[in-house]
Amino acid sequence: MAEQSDKAVKYYTLEEIKKHNHSKSTWLILHHKVYDLTKFLEDHPGGEEVLREQAGGDATENFEDIGHSTDARELSKTFIIGELHPDDRSKIAKPVETLITTVDSNSSWWTNWVIPAISAVVVALMYRIYTAED
């Protein structure tokens, strides 16, 4: 069950949150905070199904990708019921940006320069051949 600290913050484990993935109990995680959006499902401008797809898990990346307004961010605070337990925070997948940065920093120079250069030369030659036939 949920643990409580001295500051009266309720901590929920990922296992607990995963159980709340249906229309009668819809919880999700945004920036390590746990939200109960059950009563907001019908009022969500993007539709109920958008929230239900994210229910029981971390919706931080999708929330940020949509570009919610300041009003939406303020409204979301009213649905906070606690925080993700500190032990479970490392279990949440890294954002895609982090993964892309890691892949880009490990790729070699030829994938960034040689392949595009060769592709450009091939396209230029094909264009020259095509225009020379006319």
Curated annotation (Swiss-Prot):
Residues 9-85 form the Cytochrome b5 heme-binding domain. It is a single-pass membrane protein. Keywords: Acetylation, Electron transport, Endoplasmic reticulum, Heme, Iron, Membrane, Metal-binding, Microsome, Transmembrane, Transmembrane helix, Transport. Heme binds at H44, H68. GO terms for cellular component: endoplasmic reticulum membrane; intracellular membrane-bounded organelle. The keyword Transport applies. This is Cytochrome b5. It comes from Equus caballus. The lineage of its organism: Eukaryota, Metazoa, Chordata, Craniata, Vertebrata.
